[in-house]
């Protein structure tokens, strides 16, 4: 059984390795795939129990974009977007204004009469997004929407999705295997392994305090800092790996110990980033006080009390 609590007007990610079941889960949310057991509820409706007209109506409230765009190559950009509105039964007189409005939103107003073959990969994905949100959906499903794009284009697509989430109030469920995607735009994340959700919660909390071994492994790839063996073996003093979370990353902790205890502080490796405007980082530091070893011990204790975690690498 897979259970994920959906929060309205949220940006939720599903993260896992290939074969974990991420895309299959996403496809159950609009009944493209039926669950072998259990129920799928979207917007309070058990979509897994619907069929025929009721299912078609429910799907009109759920947009979807794909990894490889799935555009109709013989139709223009405007015609691709208009197709979804015609399928939803829009009045002919209202389709053209809505198409123009949505193409302006996604930055393609000047590409309305172009064909997909004339577009870049990022522009094709913008058409896919425009088509998916044209009918005012409540939920937008995104199946690895940036995996076929370069880093710069991916960033612009993610920024557009965040804009749509904030401006239109659409709940976005995004499937990805890229940790940077989750950190940059998502509010919540569900981590999948072996067809099961092994952990879920606020994105910052999952990076700062991963509970499941699989999540810890994923997070370690982005935060792990390794020193060359030469430094680990030959540098004097104590080597510490310090985890900073939230406010502790904004405090002059290392300056304090240098002044208060008279120890020399040498930063050997480090990384601090911001997830949802909250700081998360790791520093590897060397503490030395050749003529006062007790000062180093006191400095380590001071750091422990003011940061999230301290690991003594050596010393």
Curated annotation (Swiss-Prot):
Taxonomic superkingdom: Bacteria
SMART domains hit by this protein: AAA, NIL
Annotated SUPFAM superfamilies: ACT-like, P-loop containing nucleoside triphosphate hydrolases
Catalytic activity: L-methionine(out) + ATP + H2O = L-methionine(in) + ADP + phosphate + H(+); D-methionine(out) + ATP + H2O = D-methionine(in) + ADP + phosphate + H(+)
GO terms of molecular function: ABC-type D-methionine transporter activity; ATP binding; ATP hydrolysis activity
Enzyme Commission designation: 7.4.2.11
Cell compartment(s), UniProt: Cell inner membrane
UniProt-annotated binding residues for ATP: 16-23
Function: Part of the ABC transporter complex MetNIQ involved in methionine import. Responsible for energy coupling to the transport system.
Protein name in the entry: Methionine import ATP-binding protein MetN
Gene this protein is translated from: metN
């Amino acid at each position: 059984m897979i259970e994920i609590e959906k929060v309205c007007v949220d940006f939720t990610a599903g993260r896992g390795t290939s074969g974990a079941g991420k895309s299959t889960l996403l496809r159950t949310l609009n009944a493209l795939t039926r669950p072998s057991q259990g129920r799928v509820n979207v917007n309070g409706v058990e979509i897994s129990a619907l069929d025929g007209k009721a299912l078609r109506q429910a799907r009109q409230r759920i947009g979807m974009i794909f990894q490889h765009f799935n555009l109709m190559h013989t139709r223009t950009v405007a015609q691709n977007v208009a197709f979804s509105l015609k399928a939803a039964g829009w009045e002919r007189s209202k389709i053209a204004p809505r198409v123009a409005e949505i193409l302006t939103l996604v930055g393609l107003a000047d590409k309305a009469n172009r064909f997909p073959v004339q577009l870049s990969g990022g522009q094709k994905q913008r058409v896919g997004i425009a088509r998916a949100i044209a009918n005012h959906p409540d939920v937008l499903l995104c199946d690895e929407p940036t995996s076929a794009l370069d880093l710069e284009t991916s960033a612009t697509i993610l920024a557009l999705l965040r804009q749509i989430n904030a401006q239109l109030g659409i709940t976005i469920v995004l499937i990805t295997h890229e940790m940077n995607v989750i950190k940059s735009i998502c509010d919540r994340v569900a981590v999948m392994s072996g067809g099961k959700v092994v952990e879920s919660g606020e994105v910052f909390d999952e990076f700062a305090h991963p509970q499941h071994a699989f999540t810890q492994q994923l997070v370690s790839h982005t935060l792990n800092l390794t020193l060359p063996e030469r430094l680990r073996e030959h540098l004097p003093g104590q080597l510490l790996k310090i985890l900073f979370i939230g406010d502790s990353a904004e405090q002059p902790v290392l300056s304090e110990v240098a002044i208060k205890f008279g120890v020399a502080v040498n930063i050997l490796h480090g990384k601090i980033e911001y997830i949802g405007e909250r700081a998360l980082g790791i520093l590897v530091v060397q503490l030395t006080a050749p003529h006062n070893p007790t000062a180093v011990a006191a400095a380590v204790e001071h750091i422990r009390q003011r940061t999230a975690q301290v690991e003594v690498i050596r010393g």
